[in-house]
């Protein structure tokens, strides 16, 4: 990792200024709060890998201005131009008060927290695609502007969050990607966006942990369903072992699984796999 204030750091693009780490610490680190440390580095391979390898307390936050080997679900790698987004990982330790089988809600919780924060702070509608994608609308089409990756690290979970903030069309890694800028966001200053994201994450995590991880009791399950663009859609679930399942996404159950109603009248829960939103033939797309 290279510290953000190290000699040779690349701050040549004035349209993409560096994060103000001291100001972020002053705003977010407080006695009795969740966040215990916040480090900003100029570049690293993966903030999730670095934070998982470090033996630190709950509430550690690691932010990178650039990642060279960021990972998504199924170990897919991705990258983005320096200072073009929010790339961070946080360490969460639910403790004995939350049964381990409920820890699977953490990436969904992070999605709710991130989507709600971006909708408020950036002024752009941000939706969720089950289980861990952040969607925005660009030129009338759904585009992925970010994602969540949660990994177990001892008695903790490291949750990685990536959001494309200022990427231009010619910088997108794939045609289905998007960014807050391309979605017409009213604010692209990453400092207030990061503050809003971490405050939202703290609020949701504190409520979830206080409810013993019960997603219904803390209204997380309700909030996820309300913000999930997958529900009510006909989707194709691409499952392990080259299997596929097509059906209408009708619910997210108490275990965080996506429930599909198939054409045979059965309801099938899906706990892992890629979800493809299928458009009706009449849409012309």
Label for each model-derived stretch:
Residues 42, 128-130:
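Short loop/edge segments at beta-strand edges and connector loops
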Residues 2-16, 95-126, 136-285:
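Long, positively charged amphipathic alpha-helical accessory segments at protein N-termini or as interdomain linkers
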Residues 1-120, 142, 285:
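N-terminal lobe of the biotin/lipoate ligase/transferase fold
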């Amino acid at each position: 990792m290279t510290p953000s204030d190290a000699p040779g750091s690349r701050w040549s693009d004035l349209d993409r200024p560096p994060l103000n780490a001291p100001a972020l610490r002053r705003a977010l680190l407080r006695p009795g709060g969740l966040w215990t440390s916040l480090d900003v580095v100029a570049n690293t391979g993966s903030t999730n890998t670095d934070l998982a390898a470090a033996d630190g307390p709950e509430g550690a936050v690691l932010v990178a201005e650039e990642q060279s080997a960021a990972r998504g679900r199924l170990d897919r790698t991705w990258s983005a131009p320096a200072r073009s987004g929010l790339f961070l990982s946080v360490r969460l330790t639910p403790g004995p008060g939350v049964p381990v089988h409920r820890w699977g809600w953490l990436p969904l919780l992070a999605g709710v927290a991130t989507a709600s924060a971006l909708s408020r702070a950036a002024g752009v509608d941000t939706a969720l695609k089950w289980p861990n994608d952040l969607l925005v609308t660009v030129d009338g089409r759904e585009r992925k502007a970010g994602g969540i990756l949660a990994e177990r690290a001892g008695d903790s979970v490291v949750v990685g969050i990536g959001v494309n903030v200022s990427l231009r069309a010619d910088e997108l890694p794939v045609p289905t990607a998007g960014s807050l800028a391309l979605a017409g966001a009213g604010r692209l200053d990453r400092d207030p966006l990061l503050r809003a994201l971490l405050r939202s994450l703290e609020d949701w995590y504190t409520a979830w942990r206080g409810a013993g991880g019960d997603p219904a009791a803390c209204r997380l399950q309700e909030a996820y369903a309300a913000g999930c663009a997958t529900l009510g859609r006909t989707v194709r679930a691409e499952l392990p072992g080259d299997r596929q399942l097509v059906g209408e996404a009708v619910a997210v159950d108490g275990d965080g699984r996506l429930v599909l109603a198939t054409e045979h009248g059965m309801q099938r829960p899906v706990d892992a796999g890629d979800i493809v939103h299928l458009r009706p033939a009449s849409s012309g797309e």
